[in-house]
């Protein structure tokens, strides 16, 4: 935003706060607030900012924003509202974005919320599991832990599992594909012993 103190190359270029959050805070504080009193750049209505996740996108006409942060550290006595009321809503319910595509916006413009899913891939290395000699148990176990990790959090994982033989080229191809396709997380399991076909650490380190 031209002339804004937070303009520049970093992750908090634009701040947003929902009118619904301001109204709840105003009712609890027993006073009214004007747009911008919380130093938000954009005041929204009708969109649940608290339900958004980091990496989600907000489209406002030609402008494209990527959500980078929920809330912030309270400035305490350096904040006029905190000094007056004893608390502030922005540190808890405000969100911050970086600008992916610039442009001009105006009051009354619609905001489109685009969900982002974290591409999480689990790769099991096992000749016998790949051949169907026995069932892969470690991949599903890793998936269970990932699902528990994200449970109750804003992130939205999209988890896929793959069983490969203990083959360096097959693993390398899967890792390169994950990198090129923008995967957020790749977890390998298996192939870490001392046998001649336990190649996982060497392949991963070569691509690190």
Where are these regions (language model features)?
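Metal-cofactor-dependent catalytic cores
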Residues: 1-116
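Non-catalytic beta/alpha edge segments that cap or flank active sites
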Residues: 109-110, 114-208
